[in-house]
Amino acid sequence: MGHRKLSSPRRGSAGLRPRKRADEILPTPKNWPLVNLKEPKLLGFIGYKAGMTHVYMIDDKPTSPNYGKEVYTPVTIVESPPILGLALRAYHIDSKGELSVLVDYWANFEEGSLKYLKRKITSLKVDSSKMKEKLDLIQKNLNNITYMRLLVSTQPWLVPSLGKKRPEIVEIQIGGGSIQDQLNYGLSLLGKQIPVRDVFREGQLTDIIGVTKGKGFQGVIKRYSVVEFPRWHKHRKGSRKIGARGPSISTPSYVPQPGQLGFHRRTEYNKRIIKIGDNVNEINPAGGIVNYGLVKNTYLVIEGSVLGSRKRPLFLRYPIRPSWSPESAPKITYVNLASQQG
């Protein structure tokens, strides 16, 4: 059966290894895009997947065969309440030539929304007496600083559908402008509510990083799409398994084997934001979204499907390799608000 190696050399993609459970429910980007912005801006945001519906919109992509026509488009609703700026983190290249943290400058946790947040995260301990020294250290090393990033916190208590109060704390890079501009911009966000409109605009592309739906421990038929053997009397060794795996100690890594399926960290590139809205009556279906409820905060409408289950946090990042650059949002002519409960 020598032809088998040519017609079907392997199963599965090596680019998706290891096929294991994600380390955290909200992954953070491993790389950030180099953006050409005149003014500094955050390069990411966090949202919660609510569900899907469909819209009719005017296709505005010039290279599309349906350009200028009304098209049916499935969309995903992502609820995105404001995030809180917690700390400004400066990165530099250390003596080993590696990227490392120079200093963290934290906001005052005795004021405003951060006072409530401090009760939610009891492990968060900040010595405010040393903050002036840390800010002076940043000012002295501006020429050596490579990146400025902002530590932010989500506010899940603003989303009743989640049923959770413990926030996620993530790090978002500041892009655009000079390092001094990024420092001033980051300081202006500390302790403040940051809406999604300050980061993204309608019509632009975004990369979405998250964790896929978990399927548990699965066999090779479902995990690698191995062809099932015919069920007849001479196939006595089973049908839903591979024909020959060999000794376990010398089994090649590309041979399909059962194991974890789903709950993997994945990145979906160039998803388009076709709408950012505050009027929830324009997006909530009758009776609410199944297994989620009603959207009650600022929301994003993403073209197409998005990875993950309902209520799962998603990290939205500026596109690292955009396929095209939309100038504006497409015109939406109809949004389906019919009940999803039959």
Curated annotation (Swiss-Prot):
Claim: rRNA-binding is one of the keywords in the record: yes
Keywords assigned by UniProt, alphabetized: Ribonucleoprotein, Ribosomal protein, RNA-binding, rRNA-binding
Stretches the record annotates as Disordered: 1-22
One Pfam family this sequence matches: Ribosomal_L3
rRNA-binding listed as a keyword: yes
A GO biological-process term: translation
Single GO term (MF): rRNA binding
Function: One of the primary rRNA binding proteins, it binds directly near the 3'-end of the 23S rRNA, where it nucleates assembly of the 50S subunit.
Family recorded in the similarity comment: Belongs to the universal ribosomal protein uL3 family.
NCBIfam families associated with the record: L3_arch, PRK04231.1
Subunit description: Part of the 50S ribosomal subunit. Forms a cluster with proteins L14 and L24e.
This protein's name: Large ribosomal subunit protein uL3
Gene that this polypeptide is encoded by: rpl3
